[in-house]
Design a protein with these regions (language model features):
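Conserved catalytic core of nucleotide-sugar-dependent glycosyltransferases
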Residues: 1-97, 105
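C-terminal catalytic/acceptor-binding lobe
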Residues: 69-71, 88-180
Length: 180
């Protein structure tokens, strides 16, 4: 990339940026949604102002079912002021006391994804599509050919998993945001 993504996010008032959106393993996230709903119900002051502009539908199916979508923390950019905020601190402490981090292996990506999706206006969350990512099992590569050439990417676009609905939730994010 030939521009400073952090500067761009700051200038565009983005709180959170991600490259990969994954589906969590159901057994390690079974009880977290109930705790999330309970926290939300007892802390309405944090949610009412942004509820209609949030990404709640990204992580929720129907009225109260979690779909196991989360933003991977493998490559993310986040404004630390949000993670240090009273609302997130209270939320994280509540989730920690619920015991799921220790007993059910709730990951930081699940907890943070629920927070971003319900506490941050959708327009402040950004899919960073020009940024690639690769590990043993995962390849995220810009799908746009022009962008791929312009940013001198070396990843294999054919191996990209970003829009595989069985593995990721990137398309769900785009659908929720009205991006096609």
């Amino acid at each position: 990339m030939e521009y400073d993504i952090m500067r761009w996010m700051q200038d565009n008032r983005k709180i959170f940026g991600f490259t990969l959106s994954i589906k969590e393993i159901e057994r390690s996230a079974k009880k977290i949604w109930g705790h999330n709903l309970n926290f939300t119900a007892h802390n309405r002051e944090f949610y009412n102002p942004i509820e209609k502009s949030s990404l709640r539908s990204y992580i929720q199916v129907g009225r109260d079912t979690y779909n196991y979508c989360s933003f991977s923390t493998d490559l993310q950019i986040v404004n630390l002021n949000f993670l240090r905020s009273p609302v997130y601190t209270k939320y994280f402490e509540y989730m920690d006391k619920a015991g799921g981090i220790f007993y059910e292996r709730w990951s930081d990506s699940i907890i943070q994804s629920m927070a971003y999706s319900t506490m941050v206006p959708a327009k402040m969350i950004q899919h960073i599509s020009p940024m690639g990512y690769q590990n043993k099992e995962t390849v995220v590569c810009p799908a746009d050919d022009i962008m791929w050439r312009e940013y001198k990417c070396e990843c294999d676009q054919g191996s990209d998993i970003s829009f595989n609905r069985d593995l990721t939730c990137t398309q769900r994010y785009k659908d929720t945001q009205g991006m096609f």
